[in-house]
């Protein structure tokens, strides 16, 4: 015998209550209002958890943040369009989960669990959150089954076809603590971010390795080529020995710019604290020079002033001069986006924001799953071309006219 699907107890569905409904349209209208009311209650619960105290509680006095009213938002449900009130906090830090920003539909339980996981919450934390805020009982095993579905999505994303040409590709890595053969060790998630011909950024993939080496990056670049990348106009990298030669072996026409910010940090390692501010200001004259010739003169000036005291701080500039000054070949607008890896370092900072609650990961798959979800959240905001895109694209077309496919 089929089990009766009884979500609401019989005592709630009294004759008096049911007498309110004359047609199916009446029921649908009620369900739409109920749906909106439940979502608003869920959002209020999220705000309580975000602030750490309930509405009107004296605990919130002088806490540094408080409620700041609400704003209306239209959402689409299976019962039609509704308008609900989204609570705000005074510091503007509240990120709704049940009804995410920039989305017009509330989340299913599965999407809600994955969204919480992407925010850096552990399985046990999610179980507690679902029970206390959303009043949903969900076991840790059920939550694990849901989050494990992310692995397949991450693998499909990692293997997806890529564009044939990228104007710029930034390459860098971010280190995590990961359990490996019973020991917690440092592993790096290597990331490539490409600039597309429409001015939008795209994370091309992520690769996990124990240590950075030119041979490791050879595998990364080979993977990009296998997925359809035929040409990269400019690559931006850190100063890894042999990296430039590795790039040229896979993409021989690519120009490689070593990150100037990495170079500055490397030089400052040899400088005592009291001299760092002045030394850094003198280095700034090098990369802010109008052309490579003036930059070379500024490097000479730096060496005359500091070379006797800090010879190794100058030596790395000399040894990497050609790869550090590639950006002088390009107009100012392109220079600004290639002589640092700030873009990918900002990406790494946002990933850290999502993973800060994870002191270590039990496996490589766990790292990949968490970083993948973080990237999906971050890429939702990459909806606009980079600044001055029309001008920059025209410059690329003039410089690389035979290599850009319109």
Protein language model annotation of sequence segments:
Residues 64-119, 135-145, 164:
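Basic, short loop/linker segments at the boundary and entry of helix-turn-helix/winged-helix-like folds
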Residues 87-90, 98-103, 136, 140, ...:
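RNase H-like nuclease fold core
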Residues 3, 252, 285-406:
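Acidic/histidine-rich catalytic cores and adjacent linkers
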């Amino acid at each position: 015998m089929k089990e009766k699907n009884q979500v609401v107890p019989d005592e709630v569905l009294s004759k008096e209550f049911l007498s309110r409904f004359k047609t199916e349209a009446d029921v649908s209208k009620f369900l739409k209002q109920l749906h909106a009311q439940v979502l608003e209650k869920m959002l209020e619960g999220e705000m309580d958890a975000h602030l750490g105290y309930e509405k009107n509680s004296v605990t919130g006095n002088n806490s540094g943040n408080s409620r700041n009213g609400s704003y209306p938002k239209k959402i689409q449900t299976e019962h039609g369009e509704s308008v609900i009130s989204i609570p705000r906090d005074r510091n503007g830090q509240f990120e709704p989960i049940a009804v995410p920003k920039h989305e017009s539909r509330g989340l299913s339980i599965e999407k809600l669990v994955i969204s919480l996981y992407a925010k850096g919450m552990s399985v046990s934390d999610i179980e507690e959150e679902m029970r206390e805020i959303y009043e949903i009982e969900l076991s840790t095993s059920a939550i694990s089954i849901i989050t494990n579905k992310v692995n397949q999505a991450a693998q499909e994303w990692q293997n997806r076809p890529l564009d044939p040409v990228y104007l710029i590709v930034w390459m860098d890595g971010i280190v995590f603590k990961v359990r490996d053969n019973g020991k917690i060790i440092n592993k790096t998630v290597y990331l490539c971010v490409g600039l597309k011909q429409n001015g939008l950024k795209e994370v091309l993939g992520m690769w996990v390795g124990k240590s950075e080496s030119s041979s490791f990056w050879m595998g990364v670049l080979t993977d990009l080529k296998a997925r359809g990348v035929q040409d990269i106009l400019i690559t931006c990298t850190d100063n890894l020995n042999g990296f430039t030669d590795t790039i040229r072996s896979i993409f021989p026409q690519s120009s490689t710019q070593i990150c100037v910010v990495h170079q500055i940090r490397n030089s400052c390692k040899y400088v005592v604290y009291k001299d760092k501010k002045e030394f850094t200001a003198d280095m700034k004259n090098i990369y802010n020079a109008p052309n490579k010739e003036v930059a070379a003169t500024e490097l000479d000036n730096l060496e005359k002033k500091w070379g006797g005291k800090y010879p190794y701080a100058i030596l790395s500039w000399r040894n990497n001069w050609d790869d550090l000054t590639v950006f002088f070949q390009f107009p100012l607008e392109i220079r600004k986006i290639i002589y640092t890896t700030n873009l990918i370092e900002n990406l790494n900072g946002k990933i850290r924001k999502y993973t800060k609650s994870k002191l270590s990961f039990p496996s490589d798959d766990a790292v990949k799953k968490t970083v993948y979800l973080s990237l999906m959240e971050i890429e939702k905001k990459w909806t606009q071309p980079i600044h001055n895109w029309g001008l920059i694209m025209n410059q690329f077309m003039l410089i690389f006219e035979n290599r850009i496919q319109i």
